């Protein structure tokens, strides 16, 4: 299946000069969504994953069903201030300024094997911050999975040296 054909391109969003890759059209397509989850499941079914960590918010969309299919737990990595118990926090750089991600301190058991999932990798800043959170919890980052990679932005070079699965490259 050609997943790229199911991803809408929106020019000049969220600002002029940006070509936004909109996955809502992929999500609306029953066959496309099923194919996406099935491809990710096949890629990691032999990895003994304990937890799938989804990055807010679109990482939740793919992470939860993937965790279910892999027989793993799902762990949300949230923007600051959204979790109710004790958290680990990591600050990371944005194009202009910084942001913070958080995870519950008790989300992952020591040595737990973790797969981080998000919809897209661009510069890699958010995904790298998520890896730091996994380490703070005592987890073992096994791999990353992204639906889309924007290759020109070089995000891979900012990530830990673990396997990366990408379904669509631009």
Swiss-Prot record:
Gene3D superfamilies: 3.40.50.2020
A GO molecular-function annotation: AMP binding
Keyword terms: Cytoplasm, Glycosyltransferase, Purine salvage, Transferase
EC number: 2.4.2.7
Catalysed reaction equations from the record: AMP + diphosphate = 5-phospho-alpha-D-ribose 1-diphosphate + adenine
InterPro entries: Ade_phspho_trans, PRibTrfase_dom, PRTase-like, UPRTase/APRTase
Pathway annotation: Purine metabolism; AMP biosynthesis via salvage pathway; AMP from adenine: step 1/1
GO terms (BP aspect): adenine salvage; AMP salvage; purine ribonucleoside salvage
Coiled coil: none
Main location: cytoplasm
Domain of life: Bacteria
SUPFAM superfamilies: PRTase-like
Keyword Plastid: no
One protein family per Pfam: Pribosyltran
Cellular location(s): Cytoplasm
Keyword Transferase: yes
Subunit structure, as described in the record: Homodimer.
Family membership: Belongs to the purine/pyrimidine phosphoribosyltransferase family.
NCBIfam families, sorted: apt, PRK02304.1-3, PRK02304.1-5
Job description of the protein: Catalyzes a salvage reaction resulting in the formation of AMP, that is energically less costly than de novo synthesis.
The protein, known as: Adenine phosphoribosyltransferase
